[in-house]
Every structure is written in C-alpha cells, then in structure tokens.
Amino acid sequence: NFDVVNIPEALDIIGQETKPVNVAVLDSGSPYLPDPAFGGSIFDTEWGWDMEDNDALADDIEFEQGSFSHGTHVGSTISMLNDGVDGNGMSARVTPIRVCYQNGCGPTYSAYLYLNGDNNDSGTSFAQRSGGQPLHSMNMSYGGSGGSATSASCVKLGELADKGVLIASSSGNGGVGSIGWPSACPKVYAVGATNGTDRRSSYSSTNEYVDFSAPGGEYSDWNSDGVDDLVYAYAYVDSYVQTSNNG
C-alpha cells in the first residue's frame, strides 16, 4: 500500500524527520493501549473524547471484545511505528474521537464542535485537553446521503479547514454516482477506494466530489494470486491520504 500511494517517493522529497502531526480520528475509538501489539503507536487518548457516552474514555470497546475494530485499524494505519506493522504517518499522533459503533455513527457534529473549540456537550475541547496543541488533520470514515454544502456540519468543517486543518473523508461505499456527506462538503477531501489492481473498488462511491483514490478494499482476487484481496478491506482509504501533512 505504501508503494501505491508513493510513500517512498514522498519521503525522498520531504525527508523522514518530519514535524509531529496531530490527527483526530473520528471513528470507533482507540485500541486498549496496554496491549503490547500497540506499544509502538502514538494514540493520545487523553486528548480525545467519547462523544456517544460523553466521557474521556475513547477506547475502542469493540476491539477489546474481539469484534468490530474500525477505529483501531485506521488509527494504527496512521500512527503504527513497528511491531510488524508500519504506519505511514511518521510521528503522527492520533487523537481518538469516538463517534462510531457497530450500529453506525452518531454525534459527529458534536465532535466538530469539540475540535473547533466551540461549546459542546463534553464541556471541554481538543485545545483544552491537549494543552493548546495544534490540530493538523482530521480523518472520517463515515458518511450518509441527504446532506448539503450549507448544512451545519459542512459549515463547521469549513471553519476547521480555514484554520489550516486538512480534512479527509471516505467518499462512501455506494458505488458509481453515489454522493456521501461529509465527503462532499466544500472543504473536505473526498477519498475513493482502489482494489489490488489499482482499479476502483466495486463498492467505492464515485462522483464529482472525489479528490483522490487510495488502497481501500475488495473481497475478490483481482490479481489472480490465489489470495483474496481482503488485505485492503474496510475502506481505510482516507488514512493513507491525510497523514501526508508534514507541517
């Protein structure tokens, strides 16, 4: 996957001594950190928040139960340093914002308020909990239909983008012509998914709002190597794009 998104070439240009990048991952939470498999990851759990339960415990409960673990996978793709898995963030620090569960995603707008420093149900903010650290990027893997460019969510994401936050979102899983939000918001980078042969994954939403495509998943053996291309699965495409911010 690193070769597909030209990570080696990018490192030749910018060098590996990049500035730390603070990335908010709005998903199902972070892994249970005492697990030694994630000792090399940089998850700033003390900076994050569980928007659904409205508490500071943004752990990925589903991961701990050996079940759904989308947030753990995405966060590790961004920040994993070693132990058999290398992420592409190069010192990226992940702030888990828990908004997603097995049955879907919930209080995403509250998460935008939290990250933007606005009043929200948590009574705190990213700036307060991080000690005034800058937020560089946001990663969102959820979406839905029926949005608009003038919605409160798009406006709030626009405010964050105007502050210099690079915002990436999965384009969605609806196929050709399907439009998902917030990926279609004016100042959000929409990222489609490619399969093992660098073609569009069959499920990936394709529309005029898609800005990039990256490895994202396919449940078939497109390259005829006898192994399902499931290694790319779950449409984690945006996590390969947004960590390229090195400022």
Label the predicted regions.
Residues 4, 20, 68-69, 106-109, ...:
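Soluble non-cytosolic domains of exported or imported proteins
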Residues 8-110, 131-136, 184-187, 197-199, ...:
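Subtilisin-like serine protease catalytic core
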Residues 21-24, 29, 74, 127-235:
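Catalytic-core segments of hydrolase enzymes
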Residues 57-66, 236-247:
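Short pre-catalytic strand/loop immediately N-terminal to key active-site residues, enriched for Gly-Thr
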Residues 77-81, 114-121, 160-163:
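Structured segments of extracytoplasmic/periplasmic soluble domains
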Residues 99, 235-236:
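Short clusters of small/polar residues that mark proteolytic maturation junctions
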Residues 104-125:
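Catalytic-core regions of hydrolytic enzymes
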